[in-house]
């Protein structure tokens, strides 16, 4: 009777073992694996940003943290090499040989699988550590655990801070940023890798060496047209003048006329406590009324339409004109009398410029505005840097067009342009922009690919 019961009991246990191993085994193995194995993202090294003279504007510095898994090392290896490992560590890191010996022995006795050895060390030192006793056997046999950290550094500090910009990832995984960092983000980012880690004691994770791990692909380098020496001069002088006149904000752009390349951009905005820093890139992102700087566009439009020639005489009307009760005045009291169109532009006469346009385009304002459109004044530069607003050039077909629109436009009011849009036009619409897709890739002095 007892033997029958034991037999039935044994059969039941055997069936249960068979069922767990072959029927539900895969499920439980998967549960165990999910708890002990995990995929981690290995960040790629972001590409550098260089000035045209080869100076670093933005770079990623890589630092390493080193840990030791004391349990994974065999007894023979540990006992025979622990003393020499302590000597090597004392020669290259702080602390004496005795400290390292006692520190590692204690970790071994307590089964510590994630013992801190060094933090924020360079790659050169990591390579040396890989040659040390015990550690030379790697992660599986030598207990060596290496964790890489990447930090973005800006060698110029606050200079051109907004132009160089930044890029971050939001909680939804979208890239957000400003300046060159964001404009060239797709090239600078590279491609992240993947690393499988096994969970060990104390909630720590250790790299599992297998074929699933993928090394990250580092980002490309970008060479800009900025010149660090010129940038430094523009930065200092603009800050000095901004502080002198207690301006709310300011911007300065230095362009190489022959090529259209931007050699320096500097911006300052005032904080509530009266200090200045690069709050925004006003040269790209802020559109304002250009005032007298628009007179070049006005004069070109009139010359292109052949409604004026440079020697035609214009009466500046004692420096004052009236439009529906609103006055247009010259900066010189009494005006400039009768002068030719060339001198109107040279002397920047408001009344003279307004008379040229209102006399020539009376009843046909659309012709003047269409000429401006034909010249591309209403088109953005589209540098690829986010934040550039579209120019605002009113058109007679729009509802807000009125009797003041034409005279006010002629000397730069009632319209909106950014400083860089104005500068581009003044340089014959020649503005150098980099298109990585068209220019292809080159090689810099360090051997890394650049845009």
How would you name each of these model-derived features?
Residues 30-41, 235-243:
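Short, basic/aromatic recognition patches
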Residues 45-88:
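Juxtamembrane extramembrane loops of integral membrane proteins
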């Amino acid at each position: 009777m007892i033997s029958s019961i034991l037999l039935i009991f044994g059969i039941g246990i055997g069936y249960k073992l068979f069922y767990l191993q072959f029927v539900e085994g895969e499920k439980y193995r998967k549960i165990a694996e999910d708890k002990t194995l995990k995929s981690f993202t290995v960040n790629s090294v972001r590409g550098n940003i260089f000035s045209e003279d080869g100076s670093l504007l933005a770079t990623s510095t890589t630092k390493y943290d080193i840990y030791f898994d004391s349990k994974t090392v065999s007894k023979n290896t540990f006992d025979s090499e622990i003393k020499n490992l302590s000597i090597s560590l004392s020669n290259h890191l702080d602390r004496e040989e005795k400290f390292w010996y006692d520190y590692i022995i204690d970790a071994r006795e307590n089964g510590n699988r994630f013992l801190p050895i060094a933090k924020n060390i360079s790659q050169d030192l990591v390579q040396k550590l890989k040659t040390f006793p015990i550690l030379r056997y790697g992660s599986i046999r030598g207990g060596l655990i290496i964790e890489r950290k990447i930090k973005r550094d800006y060698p110029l500090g606050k200079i051109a801070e907004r132009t160089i910009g930044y890029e971050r990832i939001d909680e939804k995984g979208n890239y957000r940023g400003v300046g060159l960092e964001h404009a060239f983000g797709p090239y600078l980012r590279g491609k992240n890798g993947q690393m499988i880690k096994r969970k060990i004691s104390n909630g720590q994770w250790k790299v599992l060496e297998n074929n699933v791990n993928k090394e990250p692909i580092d980002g490309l380098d970008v060479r800009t047209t900025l010149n660090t020496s010129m940038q430094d001069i523009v930065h200092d002088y603009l800050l000095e003048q901004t502080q002198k006149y207690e301006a709310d904000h300011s911007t300065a752009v230095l362009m190489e006329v022959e090529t259209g390349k931007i050699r320096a951009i500097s911006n300052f905005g005032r904080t509530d406590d009266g200090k200045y820093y690069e709050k925004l890139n006003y040269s790209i992102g802020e559109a304002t009324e250009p005032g007298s700087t628009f007179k070049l566009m006005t004069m070109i439009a009139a010359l292109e339409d052949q409604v004026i020639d440079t020697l035609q005489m214009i009466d500046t009307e004692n420096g004052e004109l009236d439009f529906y009760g609103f006055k247009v005045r010259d900066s010189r009291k009494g005006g400039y009398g009768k002068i030719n169109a060339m001198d109107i532009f040279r002397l920047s006469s408001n009344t003279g410029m307004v008379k040229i346009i209102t006399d020539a385009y009376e009843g046909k304002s659309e012709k003047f505005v269409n000429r401006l459109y034909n010249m591309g004044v209403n088109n953005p530069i589209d540098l690829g840097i986010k934040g550039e607003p579209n120019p605002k050039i009113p058109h007679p077909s729009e509802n807000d067009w009125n009797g003041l629109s034409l005279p006010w436009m002629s000397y730069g009011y009632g319209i909106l342009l950014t400083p860089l849009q104005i500068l581009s036009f003044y340089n014959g619409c020649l503005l150098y922009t980099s298109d990585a897709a068209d220019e292809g890739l080159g090689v810099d002095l360090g051997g890394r690919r650049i845009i």
